[in-house]
């Protein structure tokens, strides 16, 4: 990890994280940067936390909490759409507003890349980034993701369609 980046560690979701996950999943401002566009109930999230195997081969996804060195949760990182045959997965990242622009996004992407490479033995990570989300595009490029395609009208925000940039990193 780069010495300029804050120290973080990734950990499994705990029942105590349910309130934070509920706020994240139901934040309508985040719906237009991903595929979620409906609210999640506490019951649904509780069921996910209780029943996820945390085995990426079983669930085809894994979600981890991002903690700083003071053990504060600063965000959430996901590997989803796991494809073991082609050794790739989509990465998703949310850094809480209070912790943005402090290097936590870079640290989280670096840590999840190390996990993907050394534990899951993936060959590639990718992300779909809203073409208007300049901060996320800069972050992924800084972390050696390459823009490989622009997908037209991929996201709909309720008023208009927006393009996404497919960002890929071969690891």
What are these regions (language model features)?
Residues 29-30, 35, 50, 95-96, ...:
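A broad detector of the eukaryotic-type serine/threonine protein kinase catalytic domain
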Residues 32-34, 61, 164:
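Short, hydrophobic secondary-structure boundary micro-motifs
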Residues 1-9, 13-18, 68-171:
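Acyl-donor (CoA/ACP) binding surface of acyl/acetyltransferases
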């Amino acid at each position: 990890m780069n010495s300029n980046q804050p120290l973080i560690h990734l950990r499994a979701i705990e029942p105590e994280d349910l309130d934070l996950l509920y706020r994240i999943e139901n934040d309508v401002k985040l719906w237009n940067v991903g595929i979620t566009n409906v609210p999640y109930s506490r019951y649904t999230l509780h069921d996910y936390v209780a029943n996820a195997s945390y085995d990426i081969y079983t669930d085809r996804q894994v979600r981890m909490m991002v903690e700083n060195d003071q053990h504060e949760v600063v965000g959430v990182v996901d590997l989803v759409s796991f494809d073991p045959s082609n050794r790739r997965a989509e990465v998703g990242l949310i850094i809480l507003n209070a912790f943005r622009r402090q290097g936590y996004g870079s640290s989280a992407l670096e840590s999840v890349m190390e996990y993907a490479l050394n534990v899951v033995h993936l060959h590639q990570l990718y992300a779909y980034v809203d073409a208007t989300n300049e901060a996320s595009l800069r972050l992924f490029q800084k972390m050696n993701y390459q823009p490989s395609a622009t997908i037209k009208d991929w996201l709909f925000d309720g008023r208009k369609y927006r393009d996404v940039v497919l960002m890929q990193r071969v690891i």
